[in-house]
Regions:
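Short, Gly/Ser/Thr-enriched beta-strand-loop segments that form substrate-interacting elements
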Residues: 112-115, 124-159, 169
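Short, gly/Ser/Thr-rich active-site loops of penicillin-recognizing serine hydrolases
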Residues: 183-196
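Solvent-exposed coil/turn segments that connect beta secondary-structure elements
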Residues: 12, 98, 158, 169-173
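Active-site lining segments that contact anionic ligands and/or coordinate catalytic metals
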Residues: 44, 51, 90, 134-136, ...
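A small/polar active-site loop signature that marks catalytic segments
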Residues: 1-88
Length: 196
């Protein structure tokens, strides 16, 4: 469990690859990427997640070959909220303005609205059904980047307590500007953009 936190918070690609190989080794007695990818596909199928575009090359995402759609990754986020391991998973994601790869992002935005003792009744009511890690205003976001690629995926808890699953991939020569777009989109969600 602590390994997953290290992988996600710090975007540790070497450790992510080792998890795939370990999964393969434990389930098949042969630690290789092919078996690890098959185990993941079997798990997805068991959870009614058909992802024909999915390509797993090394398990870390640090690849020009690996593929998954934003919509399918968002479905995994929705599945994650209902998982018995949800707290471990959600707490493993970097928290905007607090830690990991999101430590220096959205800091001013979040300072402006961090809940205090006057937290609204709406916020409390909307969050009753969610795990403790999704009961505080903010963003739990895994980031990813390659040359010409920027991505985010995770959960945003808005000012009113609405929880949004969000995934965005930018594949473009100007993807470096994607950080600005992603932060703007996350800010919009923090402000309950879809509800306005």
């Amino acid at each position: 469990r602590s390994s997953i936190k290290d992988i996600n918070k710090l975007s540790n690609n070497v450790m992510a690859r080792q998890v795939l190989l370990t999964l393969s080794l434990e389930k098949t007695a042969i630690g290789n990427t092919k078996n690890g990818a098959r185990i993941i596909r079997d798990w997805l199928q068991k959870n009614n997640l058909d992802m024909p575009e999915l390509i797993i090359e090394n398990g870390s995402g640090l690849s020009r070959i690996e593929r998954v759609s934003a919509g399918h990754l968002n479905k995994i986020l929705l599945l994650g909220v209902n998982s018995p391991y949800r707290n471990y998973f959600i707490e493993s994601l970097p928290i905007a303005g607090v830690d990991g790869t999101m430590k220096h992002r959205l800091v001013d935005k979040l300072r402006k609205y961090f809940p205090n003792k006057k937290q609204s009744e709406d916020l409390k009511k909307n969050l009753e059904l969610f795990p403790p890690s999704l009961k505080n205003y903010g963003a739990h976001i895994k980031t990813g980047s390659l040359v010409d690629v920027r991505s985010i995926s995770g959960y945003v808890i808005s000012r009113s307590g609405q929880v949004y699953a969000v995934t965005s991939f930018i594949n473009h020569p100007n993807a470096g500007l994607g950080k600005i777009f992603h932060d703007t989109m996350l800010s919009w969600l923090l402000d309950d953009g879809p509800m306005n």
